[in-house]
Amino acid sequence: MRLMSSFNAVAAAGLGLALQTSTAMAQALEIVGAPVPGGTEHQPAGTNLAAGLQWLDHMILVIIAAIVAFVCILLLFIIVRFNRKANPTPATFTHNTPLEIAWTLIPVLTLVVIGSFSLPELFLQQTIPTADITIKATGNQWYWSYEYPDVKTADGETLKFDAVRLEKEELAAAGYPADTYLLATDNAVVLPIGKTIVVQVTGADVIHAWAMPAFGVMQSGVPGRIGELWFKAEREGVYLGECTTLCGK
């Protein structure tokens, strides 16, 4: 997927030219989504949706790390303080009401805090706004077919094309580095930045999943059904997506 600052959504000829000159654009724009050796971080966020999800992920990671550290320290303290040698006479009480209240309320409050931040992100993703541009993505084994429903070609047909994976020996000629193998395609969706894009996802044969990690979006493509996602990209680039479902026979 290529995102550019200038784009004519109603000029089919312009879209055709953009698709035909994919090699030049691949060389001119930053490529986002290629594998990083030893990488453990998220891809650079290309949308506010992705930025929000990444912030939420980091926040929850901090909470989880704090819980794990607390449990480990508490376990170590109990092992040292209450082993048979240090505490030969065990306690005889059977319960501790304040402690039981605490270990009930603290997890509940923790979940409430996490939910108060995660639910707005969920609603933001699932509430589809009015689209500036709509595209349809149909999953096939093993490629994607795209349509621009609102864009017509010179002969009045809806603009559509297939995006087929490039083989290793084809990457250099198309302007892609070797590490984009299994991600780069011969044709790419071309869209503008700063516009609301709605993607309608379906499958032609089996269940697929259209995913763009840098945008923080993923939608299953089920044959006979239409699922929708949306995004508004904030930076130019060539973004590499993938199918995140084992879609084969």
For the regions a protein language model found, what residue spans apply to each?
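Hydrophobic membrane-targeting signal helices
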Residues: 20-21, 75, 118
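Active-site-proximal cofactor/substrate-binding loop regions of enzyme domains
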Residues: 64
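Hydrophobic alpha-helical membrane-embedded or membrane-associated segments
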Residues: 12-16, 59, 68-72, 108-111
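Non-transmembrane, membrane-proximal soluble domains of secreted or membrane proteins
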Residues: 27-59, 79-249
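Alpha-helical transmembrane segments
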Residues: 68-82
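N-terminal secretory/membrane targeting signals
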Residues: 1-27
